[in-house]
Every structure is written in C-alpha cells, then in structure tokens.
Curated annotation (Swiss-Prot):
Organism listed in the record: Limosilactobacillus fermentum (strain NBRC 3956 / LMG 18251)
Family: Belongs to the TRAFAC class translation factor GTPase superfamily. Classic translation factor GTPase family. LepA subfamily.
GO molecular function: GTP binding; GTPase activity; ribosome binding; translation elongation factor activity
Domain (tr-type G) ranges: 11-193
Cellular component GO terms, alphabetical: plasma membrane
Protein's recorded name: Elongation factor 4
Gene: lepA
Taxonomy of the source species: Bacteria, Bacillati, Bacillota, Bacilli, Lactobacillales
Subcellular location: Cell membrane
Membrane topology term: Peripheral membrane protein
Disulfide bonds: none
EC annotation from Swiss-Prot or TrEMBL: 3.6.5.n1
Amino acid sequence: MDLAAMKERQQRIRNFSIVAHIDHGKSTLADRILEMTDTISKREMKNQILDDMPLERERGITIKLNAVALTYHAQDGQDYIFHLIDTPGHVDFSYEVSRSLAACEGAILVVDATQGVEAQTLANTYLAIDNDLEILPVINKVDLPSADPEGTKKQIEDEIGLDTDEAVDISAKTGVNVDQVLEKIVQDIPAPTGDLEAPLKALIFDSKYDDYRGVVLSVRVKEGTVKKGDKIEFMNSKAVYEVAEVGINSPKPLARDFLMAGDVGYVTAAIKDIKDARVGDTITDANHPTDKPLAGYRQMQPMVYAGLYPTDNAKFNDLRDALEKLQLNDAALTFEPESSQALGFGFRCGFLGMLHMDVIQERLEREFDLDLITTAPSVTYHVNLHDGSTRNVENPAEMPDVTEIKSIEEPFVKASIMVPNDYVGAVMELCQRKRGQFDTMEYLSDTRVNVIYHIPLSEIIYDFFDRLKSSTRGYASLDYEIDDYRPSDLVKIDILLNGDRVDALSFISHRDFAEERGREIASKLKKIIPRQNFEIPVQAAIGSKIIARTNIKAYRKDVTARIHTGDPDRRAKLLDKQKRGKKRMKAVGKVEVPQAAFMAVLQTDEEIDN
C-alpha cells in the first residue's frame, strides 16, 4: 500500500471505547455493534461475545478489556475501520478502563435510562475527559417501562456537564437506534493522527501469554508502521525481538501484512521472557528507534493484600509460574513469596479490591488447575516505632511487638455514595458504624444526594458494598479513591487453636471493638472448623492476654458398641483407654482448618449461618 492510500485509510479509522457503570449495558451494546456490522454471523452470535473468559460469562460482568476490529459501511458510502475496546464497569477494574482509553480518540458513554447517572458513570467519564476523548452520550434501555430518558439526560447535563442535545436513545438489547450510534461514531469521533513515515512508536495496552506463540501484545500504533520480520525494541526493558506476526482481532485473531499509525492490533515476536513485555511500555523500530517513549501508565498501587498458598506445598513453583503469566495479563496484580507456620510457602499478593482478588483466585484454580487457600485480605498499615523508624505492614502476622510500636496509621478512602434522599439516613448510619468521618453532602437533584465520607479502607474492602446495597434496596452506588493515612488506635488479634497461634488467622482491629471482634471470630471458627476426636480450645488474644475463648467439642466415638451388656469392667477399661488416646492426640494432633475459616475473620454472622 502506497503512502497516499495509507493516509486515506487512516482517515477512515475510528478508535473508541464503551464506558459505563456496571450493568448499564456496555457489553450488550458491543454485541449489537458486532452484529450490525456483520463482524459476527447470526449463527456465531451469543451474549457478551467479547467477554471470552468463562468467568466473565458466568458472572455477567466484564473483567478484562477486549479490543476488536470491525468494518462499518456508512451512509456516505465509505467503509470505516472501527477499533472497539470493551471495558469493565466495576470500580476494582477502573485500571483496565484507563488503559483502554489511552488507545482511543473517543468514548461512548452508556447510561441506563432506568438508573440514571451512577458513581462509576462519573468516574469513567472523568477518565475519558482526562484522556481528552470525544464523548458520545447514549441513553440505554429506553424500551423498559421504568425508563426516563429525559430525566437521565438532565442528570448527565447537571452532574457531568455534557451536552445531551444529540444523545441517542437506544435499546442495546433489541437494537433500536444502534444504527444512529454507528453514524455518530463516524461523524463525531476524530480519525487518529500520527506520522506514517516516522519511526515506529506503539503503546502496549494489554498482553497475554500463549503457550505456542509466547507473549501476545495488544498495541495501539501511534506513529510509523510495523510488519513481520521487523526488529522491534522495548524502550523500557531494552529487549530486542523479531516480529513473527502482526494482526487484528475480529474478534478471532487475523494476521495482516502490517499495522500502521492509528491501528489497534496484536504483535507476536516469540517473546518467552514475560518480564521483557510490560504493559505501558513503548515498542519502536530497533534499527531506527524513536527518540522518546510514549507516556505509559501510572502504576496502580494494590489496595488489598492476601496470602495465596497451594494446598500441596510441592505446587509452590507452579503457583509462581501461574502468577507470572496472570500478571502479564493483569498488570495491577503484585506478588512476593512469603511463608506461614500454618500454611507453608506461598505468596503475598496485592489486589485492587475484593472482586479482583476473587477473580484472580478463581482464574488460578481454573486456568492453571491449582488448589489454593486464600487468607483473609488486609491493607497496608504504616507502623511508627519507638526507634524513629516506620515499617509498612501488609500481613497482620508481621506486626511488630506491641512494646516496639509508638503509633499505627491506616489508609482512608474518600467514598462518594450516590443515593436517593429516602436512604440518606441509612447510608450515614452505615458509614458511622464503619468508623467513617463525614465530609460533605451534595444535592444532585430534588431526589438524589451525593454523600461523601472518609472511611478506613479496611472497613470498605469486605462487606461494605453488600451492606450498602441491602440498606438502600440496591439504589445506592459507590465510588472511592485512596485519600490519606490517619492515626488509629489499632491492635493485632491472634487466634490460637489448641493452644497454638495460627499466623494466617491473625487480624488487625480497632481497640474499641477488639474484644467484641475476638468473641465473634472465636464463635465463628467454632461453627466452621469440623469437630475432631479431641476437644479444641479456640482463643483470641492481644499479646499474651486472652480476650475470648470457646471450645469445639470432641466427637465421642462409641468404643463400647460391640461389647455385650453385663460387662462393666470391660466397658470401663475401653473408656479409660480412649481417654488416654485422646490426651496423646491432643498433644501431637494437628487441627484440620478449612478454607472458610481463613475468610471467617471478615464475614458477618449472618453469612456464616447461611
């Protein structure tokens, strides 16, 4: 293809993402666009076509960004090349959204006409504005009886400040007016710019590991071209490879002769060392390199840490390999080796939130056939010691001795909770119960309020979202960001089973609630840990002080069952022998602790009972 033809082709490219709050219909709109552009045949069509991870389809959510190329025959008679990047909506995966937007010139903002603007609608719109994208508002689910398209448009104008005069009312489910969205993409989203003759400059916005092809890079070419046989250099790692294949996803991989400035596609180069190909790096021509790399991504800081341990210690290296491969596909995941007296060798992993942690554990078990135990998640505490030093503690078991500690600071988040007026009282009560500090309250309209609280992250990570939904009948939506560290009166609580401290069950609590939490956890463990044939004392302790105790009763095996009646001496002998055996087992016996026990530290009593 000559330069003039390439420039003409570049003018017909449109790169865009679909962003929205969770459940507002992003993936359904992506399905309709693929269907209406004949990218997917009716026979191959299924719901959530871009959510190719089985886990995404089961949960009905998007976890990974996904890029697909399609051709649209517009009303002006020209064929346009669309690169659509579907993005997640859950707050835990906002990092995926920011990476997607960096590869685009425009974003379709989908808002559910029955729900209106919600917390992640705002958060994702601000991400799009930060990336200087053209935003097309689309009002979805207008076919539902409870839809209020005009009220939703007013919310978008009042709360986001976007003009909605040309917003399109659609039903992604039935396809109503989706053709108008396709035309708006052509008319309103600008074509990419980028010098076709400049040295190659391409941003890696995603990557995954393929057993046959090595690392497969998802790239947005900003300048120049790349083709099979080219020598490419990773500007960060300085590694050089020869390109084996370039292509597009449509949505299956299709090899192409080249990728040029403006294209979104994939590059393979027999990359076997995962560390060479980091998301956010720039690839350039090794023989004619560009002078400076593209701005990469802000490295995400994990918000939640948990221990991941193989149930079989021999699988430790398998777990390491699996985590390395997942990290390639999920740059927000961090991990480092750690050991536990109770669980052996494993990894301390950092996650963006509880859903992220859940998804990683499930992917490790499914995709890599691992059997894992996950410890209760915790946050990073800043521990100021009497000697003037400060230690960051991610694992409660590593908390220094209480005599060394001068003060402890914990991370707080700034939580924005959008809620109907009727539920403001319930939201404030929940936030107070979770040690929240009130900031402000903004009235968004006559019926909706945005309540802002500063809440300890440790109170948010587990059941806050579920409790928020249940106390507001599902009407509240939450967005949060790390705010700062604040001093708190915190103590470490150890759990002892049969007199032995189980390091993996240690947790941090505010001193005011420590005794109550200790009693709660002890009684929960009593329900969860199966009875064994000796009595197990369950104790909670702060330092050497026991603050709670309960006992798991022993099974009583009927050793006299086979004795005929009328032999009291024999019966007494057997019972005495059983008693002596139990004493011995108690001294050497190991308590079998199920996975549920490690999560019980964070669960509510109702969840244990169900």
